């Protein structure tokens, strides 16, 4: 009986999610022309939608997965427009919600609060915002979730391979998360089938061959995305965790402070290590300093870039958040997860010179689904927190406008 009620709640919840999101979607469409990278993505998507596969904008640095999906919806040229291209991501966001709940039920069991937790992940402010734009983030995450479910439930090895290929074609760096899932499942001996193992190994090997052939993980504008050792990206990810897991951070603050007090030597060593890293390895990308359409621009220019001491003053927060994160993982912090996850997060983030909130989405979602079993009160608090952040985000987007000399329409601020 609970199973039936749970399914009905899920269907009702997804219906409400789409109904509310469609209202926001139409307002975003009416209020904006191409948003930042959509300047490249939308014309490329329209070209593929119209079956013009010879057109390619060299400013694009990802493989054409997003645009190939656009070619599928282009059964009629009437659908080859910004509206319908963006709509694909909105539909995908609802599928993400469904997969969130599926995975969380497997981890925590079938409880009502798990449904709400799935909605919280779908409403994660940066992820939710990009569900209304023609960016790769939503579909990229969908492909990773689908791949994870296929391995989790030991689906057909060919299906695992197909999901993995789709994931990489949508975003090359997804190969890192495929490697993480593979590493985790191998360490746990979940994948019993040698064929399943071979399917992932074949995918990993094929991707390595592509990188060698291409000379880079990036296609298109390689100069803007040169691999650079940038370890502080891990610290910025901790700040991302601190903001979007604030209810969980506050809930375990006393426990974390007690742990730090009992491990003073370890805390001092972390402080010394982190101070050394930020001193010698803080990197500024030219785009970060020049593009005032992202929140990271304002954070950097009003704190990190404005005061010489800021990068050092932030180190205690990094150390606290690291201990706090470990505290929130608790019984989920097994070595079979933490080892491949930490290595893959380092590879995915610390070779990126540019600080982009989008880069933190997949590692955060993976981590968030491993938190210790939350209370209903905590899940509800998180929902309220995300609602407030989303409200502020869209308020700024709709009301804060400014002109750039190279554009004849107003620019807006996004994540």
Question: What are the roles of these predicted feature ranges?
Answer:
Residues 117-119, 126, 145-151, 157-172, ...:
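Membrane-interface alpha helices of multi-pass inner-membrane proteins
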Residues 233-245, 257, 298-326, 347-348, ...:
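Hydrophobic/aromatic-rich transmembrane helices and adjacent perimembrane loops
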Residues 28-44, 56-70, 79-83, 359:
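Extracytoplasmic catalytic/substrate-binding loops of multi-pass membrane glycan-assembly enzymes
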Residues 10, 14, 264-276, 338-345, ...:
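Signature aromatic-anchored transmembrane alpha helix within multi-pass, membrane-resident enzymes
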Residues 167-299, 305, 390-403:
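Membrane-lumen/periplasm interface segments of specific transmembrane helices
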Residues 126-139, 173, 356-357:
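Short acidic/glycine- and proline-prone juxtamembrane loop motifs at membrane-interface regions
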Residues 87-108:
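Transmembrane-helix motifs of polytopic, lipid-linked glycan transferases
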Residues 1-25, 266-268, 333:
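Start-transfer (signal-anchor) and selected internal transmembrane alpha helices
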